[in-house]
Amino acid sequence: MTPAVFNITLAFSFSLLGTLMFRSHLMSTLLCLEGMMLSPFILATITPLNTHSMIMFPIPIVILVFAACEAAVGLALLAKISNTYGSDFVHNLNLLQC
């Protein structure tokens, strides 16, 4: 395992750990999810350069599109929850009332 791949895997692991630890605020959870999406994007960008594979070049763009959609939905949810409840605490939400 090269040092770059190790660092990217470590960044993904820390983002996953942050998602599991900081679940009280929605904003910190969304930031950790963005870190989790950034790590596969960087890995998918570096891999075709090392393997000289032309078929893998569109994959980072697809990952980036999914990350942008996830960020847009997350920010829309954050704005709606902040306007409705006045804060972004996750424990104030009752998902069974939908």
From Swiss-Prot:
GO CC, alphabetical: mitochondrial inner membrane; respiratory chain complex I
Catalyzed reactions: a ubiquinone + NADH + 5 H(+)(in) = a ubiquinol + NAD(+) + 4 H(+)(out)
Transmembrane helix listed as a keyword: yes
UniProt main location, coarse: mitochondrion
GO biological process: ATP synthesis coupled electron transport
Organism: Microtus pennsylvanicus (Meadow vole)
Recorded family membership: Belongs to the complex I subunit 4L family.
Enzyme class, first EC level, given as a word: translocase
Subcellular compartments: Mitochondrion inner membrane
Function description: Core subunit of the mitochondrial membrane respiratory chain NADH dehydrogenase (Complex I) which catalyzes electron transfer from NADH through the respiratory chain, using ubiquinone as an electron acceptor. Part of the enzyme membrane arm which is embedded in the lipid bilayer and involved in proton translocation.
TM spans (from-to): 2-22, 26-46, 59-79
E.C. number(s) listed in UniProt: 7.1.1.2
A Pfam family reported for this protein in Swiss-Prot or TrEMBL: Oxidored_q2
Signal peptide range in chain numbering: none
Gene3D superfamilies in the cross-refs: 1.10.287.3510
Protein name per its UniProtKB record: NADH-ubiquinone oxidoreductase chain 4L
Gene Ontology molecular function: NADH dehydrogenase (ubiquinone) activity
Disulfide bonds: none
Membrane topology: Multi-pass membrane protein
Keywords noted in UniProt: Electron transport, Membrane, Mitochondrion, Mitochondrion inner membrane, NAD, Respiratory chain, Translocase, Transmembrane, Transmembrane helix, Transport, Ubiquinone
Quaternary context: Core subunit of respiratory chain NADH dehydrogenase (Complex I) which is composed of 45 different subunits.
